[in-house]
């Protein structure tokens, strides 16, 4: 899938933006806070029906405005044009349309335009709680497996209902707990099996990317932990019910799964330097891209937001070689350092566009300005 053109009104600090893109490489440079990340976030929104950084849609509307609109004009691998529209008014439900037809469920759109974003916010994958790492698995698997996304939605709905019962100060019949526990167990087993299969296939791809970027200087790994591996999920939930009632929420289940991120045999959260952490995160996301490309019917879009920060020159050079190669499709990349972008452009050749970003205004540079 190629994003040919984007139209943006009142999204974050972007008042009005109309841009045509290169099918290969699109570079955005400017100082921090000018709107580079917001442009990438608008592209992300068109794939995931939400912002990468702010889940509250109304807070993405430009200050003192009542709405935002994002429109993307794409071209599929077979040349078919696709138009995606998102509109949001304050105090109203957002609209999401494909070729002018509104989706009845936003989840039906997930995976239609596969996308991988690498950004500074990824540091939470290492530094943050286990929910960040579960979200990483969810974002990847949901883009190629509708059954997974449906099971995850069912599980979370049942989890909310069970937690409501656990908080109740009134006596609750066991049969009522069983209704939701059986739903959690059924959906949770699907989620567990698919997470386990994904991680098994993903690990060697991830290790290969890390090895290339670091030039074999360190070994890395991933391990997946789940209550569903230890026993039947239904039995786990039933056995935990008394303690859960005391706490007022569900202590066990696939919503507590963990993805351990390792440098050697130890948690990278504890052992990794800034450069090793950044290398780990970039390798994770590039492996995510490669995995989605292998499993899907279309090449994902790749968004790279300020990825060279905290990396030494040799690792920057390895990443430049990767993204300039033929393995990746359409790329959107931001940086405050024009030299980083110039090094990539030198390797890519002529198929690129360069944009200058200043105070929410984005302008394509003429060839003589580049």
From Swiss-Prot:
It comes from the Bacteria. One of its GO terms (biological process) is DNA replication. Keywords: ATP-binding, Cytoplasm, DNA damage, DNA repair, DNA replication, DNA-binding, Nucleotide-binding, SOS response. It holds the Pfam family SMC_N. Its main location: cytoplasm. It is found in: Cytoplasm. The keyword DNA repair applies. The keyword Cytoplasm applies. GO terms for cellular component: cytoplasm. ATP binds at residues 30-37. Disulfide bonds: none annotated. One of its GO terms (molecular function) is ATP binding. PANTHER family: DNA REPLICATION AND REPAIR PROTEIN RECF. NCBIfam families: recf. The RecF protein is involved in DNA metabolism; it is required for DNA replication and normal SOS inducibility. RecF binds preferentially to single-stranded, linear DNA. It also seems to bind ATP. Belongs to the RecF family. This is DNA replication and repair protein RecF. It comes from Bacteroides fragilis (strain ATCC 25285 / DSM 2151 / CCUG 4856 / JCM 11019 / LMG 10263 / NCTC 9343 / Onslow / VPI 2553 / EN-2). The lineage of its organism: Bacteria, Pseudomonadati, Bacteroidota, Bacteroidia, Bacteroidales.
